[in-house]
Amino acid sequence: MSAPRLLISIIIMVSASSSSCMGGKQMTQNYSTIFAEGNISQPVLMDINAVLCCPPIALRNLIIITWEIILRGQPSCTKAYKKETNETKETNCTVERITWVSRPDQNSDLQIRPVDTTHDGYYRGIVVTPDGNFHRGYHLQVLVTPEVNLFQSRNITAVCKAVTGKPAAQISWIPEGSILATKQEYWGNGTVTVKSTCPWEGHKSTVTCHVSHLTGNKSLSVKLNSGLRTSGSPALSLLIILYVKLSLFVVILVTTGFVFFQRINHVRKVL
């Protein structure tokens, strides 16, 4: 199995998982359950509910539970629970929808409900016990599926766009053509729009745009119309209209003037 397909399979399993966290704590089917020892890189689809699990330590043995959250463009956030005083404390936690799954004295896991692009970052759960400290970290990468569009522009040029994907999608053409340009537009939320423009010879009737992305691949086809023409700009169209109207006005003016002078000459001859 290729690496991209393996990664897609992992993402699908994460987004559809109803497994329990390590330690025997059952999660509902509305959550994607993420579990591993140490530090892992974890891709997660946007708009799902994710649960990040603490190390599997019996709650009766814990002293303090701390979640450290480092997000892009945000100060470091800390969520802590102290068992002795049954107190919870938060520091610099401004991003919404990141909470304890339930009461931390019953479940020390963290939930993100639902995931969006602001939740990209590093999450570490630390459990302090009489036997030492245990931690589990997650490098969370939020994935956004791009919207794919394909259309024909001027002449016989096909344009394929993968709109607001995260990370940037890759575009290829079938059959292969001489790509005129590939542009990437970056947005503030971390998504990227990729636009590929490809001209084709007149004998090509149908072309296919293939978009590759970590969330899955997609292909669209379009039938090329060799007779399709579009004006260069609205200003050019306006100038053409004005030119036609002006020409018509001049013709009417000349005709009216000719008739007028003919009548004057006729009156002079009669007199």
Curated annotation (Swiss-Prot):
It is a single-pass type I membrane protein. This is Cell surface glycoprotein CD200 receptor 2. Residues 1-23 form the signal peptide. Residues 46-132 form the Ig-like V-type domain. InterPro entries: CD200R, CD80_C2-set, Ig-like_dom, Ig-like_dom_sf, Ig-like_fold. Residues 261-271 are cytoplasmic. Glycans are attached at residues 30, 39, 86, 92, 189, 217. GO terms for cellular component: external side of plasma membrane. Disulfide bonds join 160-209. SUPFAM superfamilies: Immunoglobulin (SSF48726). The chain crosses the membrane at residues 240-260. Belongs to the CD200R family. It comes from the Eukaryota. GO terms for biological process: regulation of neuroinflammatory response. GO terms for molecular function: signaling receptor activity. Keywords: Disulfide bond, Glycoprotein, Immunoglobulin domain, Membrane, Receptor, Signal, Transmembrane, Transmembrane helix. PANTHER family: CELL SURFACE GLYCOPROTEIN CD200 RECEPTOR 2, CELL SURFACE GLYCOPROTEIN OX2 RECEPTOR PRECURSOR. The lineage of its organism: Eukaryota, Metazoa, Chordata, Craniata, Vertebrata. Residues 133-221 form the Ig-like C2-type domain. The keyword Ligase does not apply. May be a receptor for the CD200/OX2 cell surface glycoprotein. Residues 24-239 are extracellular.
